[in-house]
């Protein structure tokens, strides 16, 4: 969701602060967004940030050596980046490209973990750095 949001105040442990960095837990008083519009893993960024909302990513992928099944194009999976977990499909295997059902916020260099929750054995398919 790309929209203008005004941060009125930030608090850490009931004390007002001017700014905070990850992984601090903060409370925000905001204007321009409702609680139902925000979910786990959502980010508030200024326009100059290196993060972007993407529907496709390419990875420098390393398959989990314990995951024995094959990976095929158009196969579904879940992708974890930070606190976000989104559904995706494999567009290509070499190089590994993923298409998301809903946009995901990420930047080059972050690690993405690919999951197959329906797998009866190993559920972590592998991981890779976002290119």
Language-model segments: which ranges?
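C-terminal effector/interaction modules appended to NTPase cores
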Residues: 1-131
């Amino acid at each position: 969701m790309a929209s203008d949001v005004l941060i009125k105040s930030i608090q850490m442990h009931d004390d007002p602060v001017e700014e905070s960095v990850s992984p601090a837990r903060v409370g925000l008083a905001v204007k321009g967004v409702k609680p139902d519009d925000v979910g786990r893993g959502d980010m508030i960024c200024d326009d100059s940030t290196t993060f972007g909302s993407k529907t496709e990513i390419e990875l420098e992928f390393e398959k989990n050596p314990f995951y024995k099944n094959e990976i095929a194009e158009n196969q579904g999976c879940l992708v974890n980046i930070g606190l976000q977990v989104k559904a995706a499909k494999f567009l290509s295997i070499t190089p590994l490209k993923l298409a998301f059902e809903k946009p995901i916020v990420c930047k080059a260099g972050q690690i993405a973990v690919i999951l197959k929750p329906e797998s009866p054995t190993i559920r972590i398919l592998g991981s890779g750095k976002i290119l």
